[in-house]
Amino acid sequence: MKVGIMVKIERFEGYSTMVEELEGMKFIINLPVYWKIDEDSMKNEKWNLPVKLLEKVVALIKEGRLRPEEGEIFEKENGETLVYGTKLTGFILLKPVLQGIDGDSLQIIPLYKEEISFARRMGWRRLRNMFKYLTPEELSFISPDRYNIITDIDGRRNCL
């Protein structure tokens, strides 16, 4: 199902935010300054991950397969990845990390299969608590190669 969405881009000091509104809720994805958001770049798979995620969220909600509430997790079937070239297999909806975002917003945070498995075994709140080991930038900004809080233990952050 192809869903047409109207993404709003808000620019802040140090980052940009893509916002899609549905059913009175804002779904947001924060992007680092270097992220290319011009029309030509959005045609490139490397840069259109945020738009694809927003389209997926809207489609899943309209299909009744995802509730627009904190803690909702989506995982692609059969180990498929969200986008070619990444190991991200799903996402979670959480209250926004950055200050100044209103209460009717949910942030889309892409997840690795190990993080999804952890959330299903231990609960999404435990996963959210694990995110404290990431810097605000690592968690807040979308990144196809983000640190995996379950498998990537580097001594600086002893997650488990």
Model-derived segments and their meaning:
Residues 1-13, 22, 27-160:
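Acidic, proline/glycine-rich low-complexity IDRs
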